[in-house]
Amino acid sequence: MRSVTRDQKPTVRVAATGDLHCREDQHGRFRNFVKHVNEVADVLLLCGDLTDRGTPEEAKTLAEDLAALRIPCVAVFGNHDYEAGAIKQVCAELAKATVHVLDGDHYVYEKTLGVAGTKGFAGGFGRATLQAFGEGTTKAFVQEGVNESLKLEAALGQLETPKKVVMLHYSPIVDTCVGEVPEIIPFLGTSRLSHPIDHYGAAVVFHGHCHFGSREGKTPGGVRVLNVAMPLLAKTTPDQRFALVEV
């Protein structure tokens, strides 16, 4: 049993991963993963692309394994989860395994840790961030990134917990995209997501999406950012396909 002094807040062991890309026929694929998480973590965060094609059948297969979790599970969706246009059905299947899906809102663990989550979106980084100028389609693309940033801002603004973490699918910084083909980096995230993070603060940010990116970076304000895409973790820490952080 972990002991704390009167003035300390209990440490929460957060396991985080993303980009599971579960397919309909992959029954039992995540059974050992769930067993491992149960042994070492207090809460599990799934950072998008839970399914490969966004079908309810894929979500049902994943939920079969996640149902064995003995700890809370919180998720955001990724771009793959929207592919089939069945996001409500996907959400319903995951709810059967008590997965809490965030979309611009938050989850609170034992009044100590607040989790703010949204999918995020693309748009580029720093001085190369795409601006809302020109064609209507360009403006709509930029506005989607702005909307996701505002959703994250709202989620963080609602939290009054002593500790906060952020979960996204898309990256809020360019550093964790390094290693990807340079031409696709503007589609892996946007700096707009980092603005509410630096304004409200967080202990750590988790994201996925960047299968060939880098493991870690920081926002301009110094908040730690971890890329927890499972394909990347499979290469760097094959025996533990999730990040484990004490907050």
Provide a role label for each language-model segment.
Residues M1-I71, Y82-G85, T138, V142-Q143, ...:
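N-terminal active-site segment of His-dependent metallophosphoesterases
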Residues V12-V14, D42-V43, L113-G114, K163-V165, ...:
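Structural motif
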Residues A41, R70, T98, T161-P162, ...:
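Short, well-ordered alpha-helix to beta-strand connector turns
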Residues L62-L66, S171-Y200:
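Cap/insert and terminal regions of metallo-dependent hydrolase folds
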Residues L20-C22, K88-F187, A229-M230:
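Conserved catalytic scaffold of divalent metal-dependent phosphoesterases
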Residues R2, P10-T11, K88, Y109, ...:
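Binuclear metal-dependent phosphoesterase catalytic core
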Residues Q26-R29, L50-A67, F77, Y82-A97, ...:
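Metal-dependent catalytic neighborhoods of phosphoester/phosphodiester hydrolases
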Residues A16-G18, L44-D49, C73-N79, H100-D105, ...:
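Active-site neighborhood of phospho(di)ester-bond hydrolases with catalytic His/Asp-centered motifs
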